[in-house]
Structure formats: C-alpha cells, structure tokens
Amino acid sequence: MTVFGMGDALGQLGLSWKKVMDTISPDQIAVFSGAAIGQLDVFGFGGLMQSRIKGSRASSKNLALGLVEMSADFINAYILGSVGRSGHNVGACATFLYNLQMGKEAIESGSARVVIVGGAEAPITPEIVDGFFAMSALSDDKRMIELQAQNNEDISKGPIQERACRPFGNNVGMVLGESAQFIILMEDNLALELGAKIYGSVPSVASHSDGYKSSISGPGVGNYITVARCVADAEKILGTKQLRNQTFVHAHGTGTPANRTTESHILNEVAKTYGISSWPVTGIKSFLGHSMAPASGDQLVTALG
C-alpha cells in the first residue's frame, strides 16, 4: 500500500523526482509517515502473535513489518533513497495530522525543503474488528436494521450496506477502511523554481490536548481549541467576510453517535464564536470507511479534488 500510494503521489507531482534530487541535497528531504495501530495481519504483528498458538514459527519479517513507522522506512529505502530526517508521530486517527504538523514545521524551520507526509494502514483484521466492536463503535447488521426501521426505510432485503456509515443524522457506528495517502510538501520558492504542480498550501495545523478529564477517549477542551485556532488562522488569510461565506468543513464524521454529537457541538460553538451562521459540512467516511492513521489524509485529498 505504501509503495502504490507513494507512487501515485510522485505521479501527481508534475515533474520527475530526478529533477527534485538534482536541485536539492539528499538530506533536505524529510519523510513523516506510519500507521496508528500497527499492522496486525499475518505478515506483521498478527502473524507474530498467532505463530506459537498455531504451532508454527514466527517469520523474521513479522516483527519488523508490524512496526508503526515502517511506511516511512519503505519510502526512504525503496523509493526515494532519502538520507534526510525521518519519523512518525502516532495519534490514533489524528496521526496523519500530527505528521502533517511535523512536516509543516520542518519546512518552516529550514531543516527540510521537501517533506513527504502520509500514512498507510490496513486495519481490517479479526482482532481490530473485535476491539472496535467491543467498544460499540462499529455499525453492524442488527443495529442497521433497527435504524432503517426507525427511519421508515425498506428492511425487506436486510441491511443497506451502502449506508452502514452515516456520519450525520441518526447513525449506529462506523465502518473500517484501508488506505494509503501521501502528499508532498515543498518550500514555496522551490516549488515555483521547479514548476511543481501546486494543489494547495498548509497554512495552519493545530493539535491540543484536553487537560484533565475522566475518559481518555472522550472529547475535551483541546478539540475546541484545535478547531478554533485553525479557523482564526483562516480568518487572517481570507478575511472575515470570506470566512463566513466561502468556507466549508470537511468533518471527521466517523458515523458513531458519540462523534455525531461531540463534533457537531464543537463546530457549532466555533461557528458562533466567529459569526458563521451557515457552515456547509461534509465527510468522506460514508464512502471510504475509517482508515485510522491515514483518515485525515483521506479528507485532505478529497477536499483538494
């Protein structure tokens, strides 16, 4: 997945990677990428943990392929040959954003001129499904049928799988997805010098902790600060009128009842603070599912179009 995803990113760059390498030093490239949960399939930690139970032996590759930062290592070793900074910041389903923040800061500080930001995760394994099901986070057939009946939808043919994940309105849970998303950040002057195809910019990335709270997984004040800070930065760039009339939100929108209520409240409070009376909100997980680490990357690339 990493190789295919990174290959697609290079193909959309608008110039050859050789031209980039001929212009900058190899140590001016940084790569921040990885998974959130770790690969629990038979090739990674799954195979490692199951081998003794199955009466077989673990492969020498199981442990290495299960590590969360392996996608960055694959990019450095097999695709770019980079000798620059490399790393990965794990933050559950905000992992891509954490890496994006590191990438932005690396360019701003001058420690890198080109940064690869991404993530790859394949969380559809029995163990991960069981874990989320135990948390009542997953949509399942029984609850889907109940919701369809409640909404006066046809239940004669069973659950409507295409609508298993409903980020907005009445919903019963999320659907897992698999994804590999990579973007290439460049120093402004370098992008213009090389004639790279520019899709957008990253003027603001924020991440804040929640302070004291009784539940680690529950939302807290940090979520409000994070969104409000980015909206404030957007207002500085666009102006108040454009912020209020020409912006939209690409929401996390997992499809769980908890996310529906908490994220809606965050957006509503921030909108009131900045005088936004009507704020279009969309989400992509009803089509792609929740891919964990690359989830924010799914949102970013679909927003760019």
Name each region found by the language model.
Residues 211-223, 253-271, 291-299:
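Short glycine/threonine-rich loop-to-helix capping motif typified by GTGT followed
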Residues 145-248:
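Condensing-enzyme catalytic core mediating Claisen C-C bond formation in acyl metabolism
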